[in-house]
Amino acid sequence: MKKYAISSLVTFLFLLSVVPIIAGTLDEVKKRGSLVCGVSTGLPGFSATDEKGNWKGLDVDGCRAIAAAVFGDAKKVKYVPLNAKERFTALQSGEIDVLVRGTTWTKHRDTALGLNFAGVNYYDGQGFMVSKKLGVKSAQELDGAIFCIHAGTTTELNLADYFAKNNMKYEA
């Protein structure tokens, strides 16, 4: 019972510290009259502009839903395209109000960045894609391979971990 009480108290105190930050951002958004939403840099199906310059995709719809909830108008959004390296800095600095783009929710990011993650809205996976002509049957055969990868992503870290654990080398 004592552990439960202490755990509840710690959780309550944490939530008290977060609420003013969230409320402060919401107040700023309402005062400005629009939501500044960070999205991916042209990722079809998630966040990309069409031939008329209109933003489309799952992430864009998330931004619109927030704007509709805050203002009653889904069009009160300014989209800021961000790459993987820029996304957290933009949110931490206040350049954007909310980040709605591909971002893996990790324990480190949840605890070290000072950000609040919302629920997961998309699940994906990782794997290696190689030309069939190479005849590769196992990832163990990729020692010395060269990979194209987005810097600053969880995928980059997972690739490094995989190769280190298997005493293999690669170039990115």
Predicted regions and their residues:
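Acidic, polar ligand-binding/catalytic clefts
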Residues: 64, 68, 76-141
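Short loop->beta-strand "edge-of-pocket" segments that line small-molecule binding or catalytic clefts
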Residues: 34-40, 56, 140-156
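Structured segments of extracytoplasmic/periplasmic soluble domains
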Residues: 32, 40, 65, 69-73, ...
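Soluble non-cytosolic domains of exported or imported proteins
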Residues: 53-61, 82-85, 149-154
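N-terminal hydrophobic or amphipathic helices and topogenic motifs
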Residues: 2-13, 20-78
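Short coil/turn segments
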Residues: 42, 104-105, 131-135, 147-155
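Ligand-binding cleft/hinge of the Venus flytrap
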Residues: 49-52, 64-75, 117, 155-172
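Histidine/lysine/aspartate-rich catalytic loop segments that bind and position anionic ligands
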Residues: 123-126, 152-159
